[in-house]
Amino acid sequence: MPNILDRFIGLFDPDAGLRRHRARELLARAYEGASQRDGWKPKRAGASANTDHRADGATLRVRARSLYQNVPYITAGVEAWVANHIGTGIIPRSLAKNADIIDALYDAWGKKADADAIFDVNGLVAAAERAAYADGECLVRLRPRLLSDGLPVPLQLQLLEIDWLDSAKSGTVGGNTIVNGKEYDPLGRLVSYWLFDQHPGEQVSAFKGRAASHPVPADRIIHYYAPVRPGQARGVSMLAPVIARVRDLMLYEDAELQRKNLETRLGVLASGDVETLSMAEQNATDVRQTGDLGTLSSGGITRVPTGTNLTIVEPKAAPGYVDYVKYALHLIASGMGVTYEMLTGDMREVNFSSARVRLLEFRRRAEQRQWLNTIPTLSNRIWEAFIDAAVLAGKLPRSDYACDWSTPKWDYVNPEQDVKADLAEISGGLSSISEKLRRRGYKPDLVFKEIKSDFDRLRSDGTLDIFLQLQTNQAPQAAPTKPTTATS
């Protein structure tokens, strides 16, 4: 709307007034999403990621844990994510000259890697992924051990819930800055983590005071989380986008259950001479005060006085319950990064094409997390700590961190078509055999050794020709029989 200045300019220079009006309209319509007319004001607008975490991180964490513990489809979604993302393990294979020695040592150490003696190293990584998904983050503490402890490598890993980190610790100490329990030097390099001596929620003493936190060197801690915003020092639960919607769905289900309970109760409205319907003396008070005439016995015959009108109350059914629940579960699955079928186990509306499209999209997201987050920030750190400890213990001559990682193999959606496509890529030079093996979770070197061993055995047994004929769908020729001679 033109103001006084616009009118004044338009009076003496209409062209200039028109240009001002057009410019104002363009500015007003540039971003409708920034309009202030609807009163939408995001919470803590302009706050940093660390400020948001300091305010809401703990609440999101406890709510996410509650959903994981109590809501079946949330549990199914988280477990499906971990099963597909980690599976039976993300396996390293050394590329050093003494790779066989390193790999054998790692396999032996992995069985004893857990400081709590619960998991092997792959199980510990899976537990870390589960905790990082629900809580948003977790800690893995590197625990050096003595040679006398008898471990293959004197190192163990202790998986800690993020509650061990003193999130309330912020400020400055000795020229360093502490942000949500993480201490940085003046150059912004991570120096230490402020950890409690025990889990703050552990009930070990009824009279314990507030636990004190102490700094632990950063090179002894692996902080596993997936930052979303630049400068984000702490992780946020991956359930955060769906917490409110899951809660709304739970309330809706409770309301529907209550409505169904009311529908199953047969209600009757009586009109006319209702006083004669209640003959029992114990119900006289109820009749006078509330008009309650008692209950209807199942299968019984009730005598109704003349002049009494009875009307059965029939609550109207509310349609759309199933449709809304399915719609909400689709949104929840999308927010969790899994498919609807993984979340619910409902396969009734799935066909081959839709299942393939959903799985491909899910796998892209899982692979991105594997290669851009889990492997560089968790698996590599564990591998490097293992190599360092082995060198210090004299188990290896030198540090050589080079390795290949094998992620969990994906099951085929259509085995015949998928294998043909892979073979076409290999023959066309678009991929290598090793790459295809790694994408399926196999270790190329081990596969090649097994193939060589198999062919050597076939050759030594004289059955190689038969095997090759079977590969070309040709039946092997029967061995000639010796002629028989007649006996007199």
List the model feature ranges, each with a label.
Residues 96-103, 300-416:
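Surface-exposed loop-to-helix/strand elements on domain peripheries
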Residues 69-224, 396, 425:
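Structured, mid-chain assembly/scaffold modules that mediate subunit interfaces
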Residues 220-358:
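Extended, charged amphipathic alpha-helical segments
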Residues 12, 109, 225, 246, ...:
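Generic structural signal for hydrophobic core residues of well-folded globular domains
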Residues 2-18, 346, 356, 373, ...:
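C-terminal anchoring/interaction modules
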Residues 59-90, 94, 124-133, 239-259, ...:
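Short, Φ-rich (hydrophobic/aromatic) sequence segments
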Residues 102, 106, 325, 329, ...:
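Short amphipathic alpha-helical coiled-coil/interface segments
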